[in-house]
């Protein structure tokens, strides 16, 4: 259903509010550069500091600008099941292709609680759901067994795997089968994830290098391993630079250097230090994205 380079979109801010024009232009640029899909209001989009009204507005803008040219997988997760249902219902009404639903954070549900959470969303809204498993932020790790149970539900179509465990996609593929869409949530290991059964990456780096990220994924898809490796190696310093500090600080700064938006964030997120800025700028230059 989904493949390739799918960008985890930043949310531009200006003067305390969402910079809608910058966001619209950014989505257009992503599509023009060859990005295969869009994820608004995920972790990188600072969804946790958006109001519900703002969250819905960003989804709506993304769907309107993309006009069906690429899939829109809207972030609709919450640690409240009812809230996740409400956001997912809005995403469907807005015309999103699917929903990206993060595992509930902070309240640490059991595996049975995770199953019940996703089943409730699945049963309430007729929209494809991609599970977002990111234990480093949510402090809960969905097991392969739980995911296999959920995969029996017709609208649970895949996972964004940000576990960092490169054995996981192989185990998941063996347990669930090749039709379950596995997308990497880690840029630095995206190509290794492909070799283990993945079909793409929901990428932070694609915010500032959409053409290169798409080219790398396309090279894999057509079996051009030499080109894939060349682009992978070119991107590696940038992958590192964008996570020297907590994302999305570095990637927003990088986007500001490219003239795509201001680097503004909302507290408790703060702009990166000068040392991080220097690393990010150097990586953009080395990758050929900045002179």
From Swiss-Prot:
Gene Ontology biological-process annotations: diaminopimelate biosynthetic process; lysine biosynthetic process via diaminopimelate
Pfam families to which the protein is assigned, alphabetical: DHDPS (PF00701)
Site label Part of a proton relay during catalysis, positions: 43, 106
Binding positions (pyruvate): 44, 202
Alphabetically ordered keywords of this record: Amino-acid biosynthesis, Cytoplasm, Diaminopimelate biosynthesis, Lyase, Lysine biosynthesis, Schiff base
GO molecular function: 4-hydroxy-tetrahydrodipicolinate synthase activity
EC number in record: 4.3.3.7
Gene Ontology CC: cytosol
Active-site residues (renumbered): 132, 160
Catalysed reactions, semicolon-separated: L-aspartate 4-semialdehyde + pyruvate = (2S,4S)-4-hydroxy-2,3,4,5-tetrahydrodipicolinate + H2O + H(+)
Recorded metabolic or biological pathway in which this protein acts: Amino-acid biosynthesis; L-lysine biosynthesis via DAP pathway; (S)-tetrahydrodipicolinate from L-aspartate: step 3/4
InterPro entries found in the cross-reference section: Aldolase_TIM, DapA, DapA-like, Schiff_base-form_aldolases_AS, Schiff_base-form_aldolases_CS
Domain of life: Bacteria
Subcellular location: Cytoplasm
Role noted for this protein: Catalyzes the condensation of (S)-aspartate-beta-semialdehyde [(S)-ASA] and pyruvate to 4-hydroxy-tetrahydrodipicolinate (HTPA).
Protein family: Belongs to the DapA family.
Assembly behavior: Homotetramer; dimer of dimers.
The protein's name in its UniProt record: 4-hydroxy-tetrahydrodipicolinate synthase
Source organism (scientific name): Rhodospirillum centenum (strain ATCC 51521 / SW)
Name of the gene this protein is made from: dapA
